[in-house]
Structure formats: structure tokens, C-alpha cells
Amino acid sequence: MSFPKVIVVSTGSELTAGRSQDTNSSWIANELFGMGFTVSKFVVLPDDPVVILEELRTLTELSMRETSILLVMTGGLGPTEDDYTLEAVCRLKGVTTEESPVARQRIETFYKLRGRNFQEAMQTAIRQVFVPKGSIILNNSVGIAPGFITSLAENVHLGCMPGVPGEMTEMFREELAPWILKTYSSRELYSGFRFIWWMSESQFQKEFISKEKAIADGKAIWGVAAKRGYIRASFQSDSRALVDDLLRKLDTFYGTKSTPDIFEELPRMLLEKKITIGTAESCTGGLIAKTFTDVPGSSAYFYGGIISYDNSVKTGILGVKRNTLDEFGAVSRETAKEMAEGALDALGVDYSISVTGIAGPGGGTPQKKVGLVYFGIGQKNEETEIHEHYFPFPRSSFREFAAHTGIYLLYDRLKRSA
């Protein structure tokens, strides 16, 4: 089948009301991008059967102008009365439903293990086991509700998955993605990315993208996503050599500010080199430690973190001198240095990260403004490095900028020490 126009549809009144973010669509688009497919449109719909039906009908009518259309839809397959996707698809196709035997068995097992009578939940939970008649069933290895693939017209295919992110991601990778690759003639595309630290999207476009002839000529597609403390710059082309060349140019142009995904690379480095680390955090309140311990297996290298929010913890546990606090203040190079060195001793680790700053909105002075932050990167038997940064952002954003920067600074020191 020819290369399709791809449209991603998300349903949920919590999305259209702004109470939740649609993370599913961006995740799906990124996966499809890596498979060689580019999303041309995103659609977000409320839990309204009329709206869902009309939008699917409108999208299907695009088939008269397109060679092939692939709709990837999430949400509306659960047990509650506001789950309307199945109903809308069946009405559009003029078909009834049929039961997924696998889903039926999973839901019966689910209730039996919890000591509940399956019949008591029949009126609501049973809704999850049905798909449009004649569909290809997408099994749910995480939850209960199956997804399905069905045709809405000769050249329009619809793949529906649950809206729960954990269920959706597994179903996409295990069930839907293999079907897409088998069904459509995808272009063989190559992609790559880098994190560029302390960089804005507009600055990146001005000083790098605008000067690349291959991008101007349409030989490569580029994308950029702003994160807290860095941007993620990506390239895609049917030429592997061109993608590799763009990445090399990035590394040359930005130097140590250009990195791979350090949140994946740093744990690998720590495990490989058998390095242990710990943290001493003030203004980030343990966010750096959380980021490390979110990774499975982090106990092999992360020994612990000390949240020294109050000065008494800085002096009592980390050994920061009272004279240092009195003379230079809690937010200072000197305090960051003693915090990092105190963490090395208190936790018995090879490397440490310390951070102390003014998250705001109060606490700033003309000499030390809100957003000022100091980092210490300690290394056993080596000189502690101190770094000063300024992140004049709201409190939550400041904390993320600071946490990500602290992790980057450790990564950078390890790379230089290799």
C-alpha cells in the first residue's frame, strides 16, 4: 500500500478542558517519525459521541483527495459511559460489535484474583471486551480493553488504542507498529538527535539551521523541542551519511554543550565504570535524586541524597562551616563547594552533585537575585568544581532547570575525566 497521510486523534474531555496534557499524541508522532512516517495533523476531541462521529466522517471524506490515510486514535475504549469511540466507529461503519476472547479472559481473571464476582461488574466492565465486527484485534498486555484496526474506506485505515499511556505505548509497540510497517511502504529514513544545553529554539535556528544548505534544499528534515535547560534537536533524511554529517557539525559547533540523551547515557557510564554518586540539594528539594532513582537499577550507582534545605542540615550533616554561611551566605560558591565535599564524605561516594540557589518568588537581594544558583561537582581526592548559573523563571521551572543542569555538569565532568 502507498505511503499514507497520517493523522493522530486523541479523545477525552479532560484534554479539551485543559485539565490534562495530551502526551499520547507527541509520543506516537515520535515513534512514527522513527519508523519513517510523518504526522500531518493532530486532532483532539471531547468525550462527545456526536463530535467523535462527525470528525471521523470528515477525516474519512479526505480519502477522496488522498491516496491513502492512516488514522491513529487513542481514548474512549474504557468501561465508563463517557467512552464513545467504539460506538462512533460502529455507527460510521454500520456494523455491530464482537467480543475479544483474550480480553474476556483477562477481565474474568482480574476480578477472580480480587475476590469479586464477575457478574456484578458485567454491566460496566464488560464494555471493554468488544471491538467492531471484522476488526483486527490489538491485544492489551497491560490492561484489559483491546484496541483494534479497521477500515473506514478502501484507502482509510483506523487504529484505535486505549488512552491510558502505559497501555497505549505497549500496544503500539507490540501490536500496531508491526502492522503499520507490514501494511505500508514506508520510506527508509534515518534519524538522529542531540541535546543542546542552555540554548533557545530561535537562537538554534538562527545560528545553525539557517546556515545548513542540506536543510534549505529539503534533503533533511529538522525538528526542535524546548526542554528545561536544553533543546532536543533532531534530523531525519533518507541518507544516513547526511544525518551523521549534521550531527558531527552540531558537535563541532557547540562543543561540550552538544550531548546525547544524558538521562540514558549517564546511568550507562556510571554502571560501566562502577562509579558511585550522591547528591546534596537545597533549592531543588531532592529533584536531582528523584531523576536518578526514576531509572531502574539506579541503586547500583546512586547511594543517596541529602536535602539540606535548612542551614542546620548543611552544618550538621554536610559539615558546612558556620563561618562560611555567615560570611558568604547559603547561596554562594563557598557553600556549594562545602556541600559537595560534605556529600562525598557523608555518603562515601566517588562523585557528588550539590546545588544551592534562590528559587523565589521571595528571598532575592540586589546582590543575589531570584534565579541565582550554584553547583558543586565533587570528586573523591580531586578538586571540587563550582559553577554559577542564573535561571530567572517561575519556581517549578527553576527547579527543573537546576536539576537538569546539575546532572549535565556531572556528565560533563565524567566525560572530561575519562
Swiss-Prot record:
Species, as recorded: Leptospira borgpetersenii serovar Hardjo-bovis (strain L550)
Similarity comment text for this entry: Belongs to the CinA family.
Cysteine-cysteine disulfides: none
InterPro entries linked: CinA (IPR050101), CinA-like_C (IPR036653), CinA_C (IPR008136), Competence-induced_CinA (IPR008135), MoaB/Mog-like_dom_sf (IPR036425), MoaB/Mog_dom (IPR001453)
SMART domains: MoCF_biosynth
Pfam short name (any one): MoCF_biosynth
PANTHER family the UniProt entry points to: NICOTINAMIDE-NUCLEOTIDE AMIDOHYDROLASE PNCC, NMN AMIDOHYDROLASE-LIKE PROTEIN YFAY
Protein name: CinA-like protein
